[in-house]
Amino acid sequence: MAGKRRRSSKNKEKKEKGIPYFDYNLLFIVIFLLCFGLVMLYSSSAYTSAIKNHDSMHYLKLQIRNIVLGLIPMVFLAKVDYRYWKKLGFFAYIVSLILCVLVFVPKIGSSSHGSSRWIGIGPIQFQPSEVAKIAVILFMAMIIDKIPKQFDKFLSLVKVLAMLIPLIIVVAISNLSTAVIIIGISVCMSFVASPKYLQFIIVAVAVVVFAVAFVMLAGYRSTRIEAWLHPETAGTDAVFQTMMGLYAIGSGGLFGKGLGESLQKLGNVPESQNDMIFTIICEELGLFGAICLILLFILLIWRMMVIANNARDLYGSLLVIGVMSHIAIQVILNIAVVTNSLPNTGVILPFISYGGTSIIFLMAEIGLVLSVSRGIRLENV
């Protein structure tokens, strides 16, 4: 027995040998996106912020605070061995489910724009749906890592995805777009474990049916669909926001009007610092600036693919795939909405749009990815 233990410890040491690795490329891309986001946030919000808050730097100051707060979990998670979180996957899922339910409890949950999405504890407000995204990543990575071979069976896939139904339903009641993102994350992680096309086509059809059912049940969502299909005749605020956003994109031309020179941000594009910030980027920096930003996101996704492909174990690879899926889906949804390719959903642009909870948890997810990258060992040449 002692001999076996010595051999296993030697094998472990052998596996750990090699040059320690840390993906500074990923870190620099994230830092650049955050800095670029601060510049565009100030540009898009200075006018309305000066009128509403008597301080043109109001949103900029809050975003800097959010980024500083986000650095704490990012650095912490980057330094802690990611394998530690494997045993907390189910706990994270249950906590996120409870938090999402608390949104509907009077005096705890708070509403904005007709949706209950926040929990208020004194002066602090946060979105439990952001907690749910990272919780689902941890939960799915844990489950798939335990039964990787069983994912070849369709029934096993259905059972795992069925475990997420309570959380998806609770989130979808107040925030359908986040529910779609959670489903997308789960499906992408499952597809990596078992890339069988037929079973995922069946799941995709089920998701579409689920989304249509929720749209039909909620009147304001069906109104958004109608406004999306006929924006020129509908008279809702969402249509006005979309139309003004399209004007901003169209007026930017190839190279834009110049940084800070947007006209649509002067009260014409509502929430220009949030989910519509991409329209201001297009107006001020033009098609060239928009393409550069999209390429930067593609570079970010590519770095994550490299880390996932070289992770030391399946669990680490799944964590990175989950974060990568989250960011990719959110970028696609945001750009699709502002170009009127999809109905208005309120999905923000990662690292660029103004947001408290979203920025903090996005940076926490980046910390997880960096932790996985630290586990990679380069071969000695």
Go through each PLM region and give its residues.
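Hydrophobic alpha-helical transmembrane segments of multi-pass inner membrane proteins, especially
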Residues: 31-35, 43, 52-241, 279-340, ...
